[in-house]
A protein has these predicted regions:
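Feature captures the catalytic ectodomains and active-site-proximal regions of enzymes
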Residues: 1-395
Length: 395
């Protein structure tokens, strides 16, 4: 048996008045997901335990069949693993975003979704001036980077606010707080004049693109402890395709292969067809392949209802049919689900359970008429903890 997992990041949400009380997932045209739901098992999965931040790291850890509590790794450390950074015992890795503040307000947590080329140039400029025995800055993809701090374990307990949680709000009240926070705030302040004279920003000003006015640190993580590799835990080989460092970092930590597919990105510019075709090709020498698509989450953070619907529809139109065609051989099971909701009204993650569907040989339908939060709730099936979805897929 072969297995395909499709993660529609942040695709779940809340009912919207503009959509007649329907969610973006309900309103999206998803005939292929709906067809799988009618023939498969549909329910809700509790991917984020009570009391835990509804992060993609926790939720995706659950989907992969691990416990986000017992197998917890801080987000910064996960993304550091994706970049090939080996953390020492006295090092803390943090996500560092390039952002845009306008009159002190978080106008873009992603500096207008700056290109990787431009962002890396800016990060190189900052690193050249600020890297020392305490700080090391590593470029990532687009606006997402990693800052490694040596000798300050207290940073693990600082209070942080992700910048995407405060879009359109004054940033100053949400700066890091607690013991050690002043170290990070000082770093962020020292980066500002470097950004003001950046050659990249001069070019962006001419083109009318949002300037990178600041950097913002959050999501700390220390070196991961002993994690059981996926192959040892499940007895099968696996691979991951994703346009973001989070999933690629989880792949590294859990011993999964990473698929390098040209055109796969973490935004609406993702080449869905290339991602689907590359993942399906990987089934020839892997038992399980995970297709992670970030675009619905990005549009949820932007509060763009139409764009989020379009992203969900693109997955259904360009990825799911190709998976179904491969499944016609009769030896493929499919799991499709969001990791968490990213409601348009909230513009950040929520902690509610998310819909899932499992379809394929040996799976008997349980009465769902389509794939949505409402249909999943109507079946009465709830998997808590959410890691049980992997058990259901592989049983």
């Amino acid at each position: 048996m072969k297995y395909v997992v499709v993660i529609l990041d942040g695709a779940a949400g809340w009912p919207l008045t503009e959509l007649g009380g329907r969610t973006t997932l309900q309103s999206a045209s998803t005939p292929h997901l709906d067809a799988l739901a009618r023939e498969g098992v549909v329910g809700l999965a509790r991917t984020v335990p009570d009391g835990m931040e509804p992060s993609s790291s926790a939720a995706c850890t659950s989907i992969l069949g691990y416990s986000p509590v017992a197998d917890y790794v801080g987000r910064g450390a996960i993304e550091a693993a994706s970049l090939g950074i080996d953390l020492g015992p006295d090092e803390v890795a943090l996500r560092l975003n390039t952002i845009t503040l306008t009159d002190g307000v978080m106008s873009s947590y992603a500096a207008g979704h700056i290109s990787t080329e431009e962002s890396r140039a800016i990060i190189s400029e900052i690193a050249a001036e600020l890297d020392d025995d305490t700080f090391r800055l590593y470029p990532g993809v687009s606006y997402r980077h990693i800052l490694v701090v040596t000798g300050h374990p207290e940073l693990l307990d600082v209070g942080y606010t992700p910048p995407h949680d405060i879009s359109g709000r004054e940033a100053a009240p949400h700066l890091p707080t607690g013991a050690g926070a002043e170290l990070l705030i000082d770093y962020m302040e020292r980066a500002r004049p470097l950004l003001e004279r950046s050659a990249v920003n001069r070019s962006r000003a001419k083109s009318g693109s949002p300037l990178v006015t600041d950097v913002w640190t959050f999501w700390p993580g220390a070196a991961a402890g002993s994690l059981v590799p996926f192959a040892e835990k499940r007895g099968i080989s696996s691979a991951v395709t994703s346009g973001v460092d989070l999933l690629n970092g989880l792949a590294v930590l859990f011993g999964m292969d990473r698929l390098d597919i040209p055109g796969v990105t973490g935004d609406s510019g993702n080449d869905y067809v290339a991602q689907a075709n590359g993942a399906i090709a990987a089934l020839s020498d892997h038992d399980l392949v995970i297709i992670h698509v970030e675009s619905p989450d990005e549009e949820g953070h932007a509060g763009d209802m139409a764009a989020k619907i379009a992203a969900i529809e693109a997955i259904d139109r360009l990825i799911i049919p190709r998976v179904i065609i491969r499944a016609d051989a009769g030896d493929v099971r499919v799991l499709a689900m969001p990791d968490h909701p990213t409601p348009i009204l909230l513009k950040t993650h929520a902690s509610e359970s998310v819909p899932f569907l499992v379809w394929g040989p040996g799976i008997v339908g349980n009465g769902a008429e389509g794939f949505s939060e409402v249909e999943a709730d109507s079946t009465g099936l709830v998997l808590d903890p959410g890691s049980r979805v992997m058990d259901l897929l592989l049983r």
